[in-house]
């Protein structure tokens, strides 16, 4: 709401006198809200935003422009944008009725022009943005995102802000290798399982991570280590020699969280995965 004031001056015969000051309030007819459907984000994933413009006036508001700062934040002497508009993702509804897509400038910042909000009604704008390498993946990090609506019929720009938080979760991959790759009967062979965590939280015992494998050919006389520490059958792992079925006991596999580094020049984040290694050696 904008408060205005003014005062009159009366002059006569070289004299001057001032009136009282009067005050008024310029009521805003347009309000805006912004909501992220997901609420959290992951690197490389899409965030869906819903912007609702509500017109409480008796006249339609036309030719409005919406600008989205795509989460821009200062870095060095410039600005970094952790979100990238996803091309052709925009949908517009006026009082629930689909509308033609408006003109879009991907930016950053994102610009959407030619928006109309009906009298006594609302216009909903839905679009997506992809999380890029300028967004921090660290646990607790946020992207604060603001839209600004301008245009004729508005006393002042109208803004709305939404915050999404980096999703706190591990993200695991596993790679298996064998050495040697060519063996003969009664020769030892070693399988190595490399587990990598690119997520921002560790895998702990209560996550109950389990590795299972069926060795073919079947192995005997197993020697199992995890991160260089010997494991005992029936305690940290189980093995059925008749079938070759191997499995770790739930909760024995733990993996540290990844670490993230922001380049001091480019501002881009890089990831160093947390790792854990399981080795299984046996006789063919």
What are these regions (language model features)?
Residues 1-284:
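Exported/extracytosolic protein signature
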């Amino acid at each position: 709401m904008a408060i205005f004031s003014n005062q009159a001056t009366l002059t006569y015969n070289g004299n001057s006198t001032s009136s009282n000051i009067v005050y008024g309030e310029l009521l805003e007819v347009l309000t805006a809200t912004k909501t992220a459907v997901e609420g959290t984000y992951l690197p490389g994933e899409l965030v869906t935003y819903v912007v609702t413009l509500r017109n409480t006036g008796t006249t339609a508001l036309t030719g409005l422009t919406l600008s989205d700062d795509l989460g821009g934040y200062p870095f060095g002497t410039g600005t970094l944008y952790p979100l990238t508009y996803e091309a052709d993702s925009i949908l517009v509804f006026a009082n629930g009725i689909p509308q033609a897509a408006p003109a879009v400038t991907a930016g950053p910042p994102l610009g959407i022009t030619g928006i109309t909000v009906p009298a006594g009604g609302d216009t909903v704008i839905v679009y997506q943005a992809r999380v890029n390498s300028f967004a921090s993946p660290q646990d607790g990090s946020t992207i604060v995102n603001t839209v600004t609506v301008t245009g004729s019929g508005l006393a002042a720009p109208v803004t709305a802000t939404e915050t999404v938080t980096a999703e706190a979760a591990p993200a695991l991959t596993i790679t298996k290798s064998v050495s040697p790759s060519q063996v003969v009967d009664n020769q030892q062979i070693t399988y190595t399982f490399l587990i990598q965590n690119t997520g921002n939280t560790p895998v702990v015992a209560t996550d109950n991570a389990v590795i299972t494998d069926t060795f073919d050919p079947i192995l005997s006389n197993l020697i199992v280590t995890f991160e260089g520490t010997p494991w005992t059958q029936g305690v940290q792992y189980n093995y059925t020699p008749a079938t070759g079925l191997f499995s770790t006991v739930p909760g024995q596999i733990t993996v540290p969280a990844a670490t993230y580094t922001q380049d001091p020049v480019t501002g881009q984040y890089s990831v160093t995965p947390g790792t854990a290694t399981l080795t299984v050696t046996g006789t063919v």
